[in-house]
A protein has these predicted regions:
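Conserved catalytic core of sirtuin-type NAD+-dependent deacylases
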Residues: 1-240
Length: 240
């Protein structure tokens, strides 16, 4: 079994979502959709602005810095340790799966704690990458370095995309956790698995476009449903 995780799981840790009635975009408006193009056109200016604004704290950045893994994150880490969950594909950038103890993770939208070379995809923990250049360059290939978070207009890193397709094709079940299943390419992965015979299990208080093809649906927050699912699955394994 693998999992596709969306913003609903992070919301339970106090991180606001972008979409939806109480999302940040409804309150503050959508950000520019050409962020990556702006970065490519003048990376030095982009980095200069980023460094100048790094002391400012937005609602989202404050929430994400203060967030802790919730019961859903912990249950998924326990599922991995028990051999029940083989891989997590997450759309979240908050690093909470790692903090909870999960190891087999593909972060399709990047990780806020890392920097990444846009040429060779090498990644570094944010605090370990030190460069006197603006914009910073990769020590391996001299490519431009930016934060690992995928910007609007930026292609999903190829290594992450390949990992997602590989895991989807070999999954026998997909756990859909707090994802609206409307953002592509992420919403495509469970469909690929389903067409190859995998069962889909949805954990979401709300109905999604994938609900009708799910074998099981748990209409509850992840922090409530996943610990119960973990215990139920452990019981079935122990009794088999």
């Amino acid at each position: 079994m693998i999992a596709l995780v969306g913003a609903g799981l992070s919301k339970e840790s106090g991180i606001p979502t972008f979409r939806g009635g109480d999302g940040l975009w409804d309150k503050h408006g959508e950000p520019p959709m050409d962020g990556y193009q702006r970065f490519l056109e003048d990376p030095a200016a982009w980095w200069a602005q980023r460094l100048a604004e790094q002391e400012k704290t937005s609602e989202f950045s404050k929430a994400i810095e203060e967030a802790k893994p919730n019961a859903g994150h912990v249950a998924m880490a326990e599922m991995e340790r028990a051999g029940l969950l083989k891989h997590i594909i997450t759309q979240n950038i908050d690093d909470l799966h790692q903090q909870a103890g999960s190891a087999a993770i593909t972060e399709i939208h990047g990780n806020r704690t890392k920097q990444r070379c846009i040429e060779c995809s090498r990644r570094w923990p944010r605090e370990e990458f030190v460069s006197g250049e603006v914009p910073p360059r990769c020590p391996d290939c001299d490519g431009l370095v930016k934060n690992d978070t995928v910007m609007f207009g930026e292609p999903i890193p190829q290594d992450a995309l390949e990992s997602c397709f590989r895991e989807a094709r070999r999954a026998d079940a997909v756990l859909l956790v707090g994802t609206s299943a409307v953002v592509y390419p992420a919403a495509e992965f469970p469909v690929i698995a389903y067409r190859q015979g995998a069962r889909l299990i949805e954990v979401n208080p709300q109905e999604t476009p994938l609900s009708e093809i799910c074998s099981a649906v748990l209409r509850a927050p992840s922090g409530e449903a996943l610990p119960r699912l973990l215990e139920r699955t452990r019981g079935l394994v122990a009794g088999s």
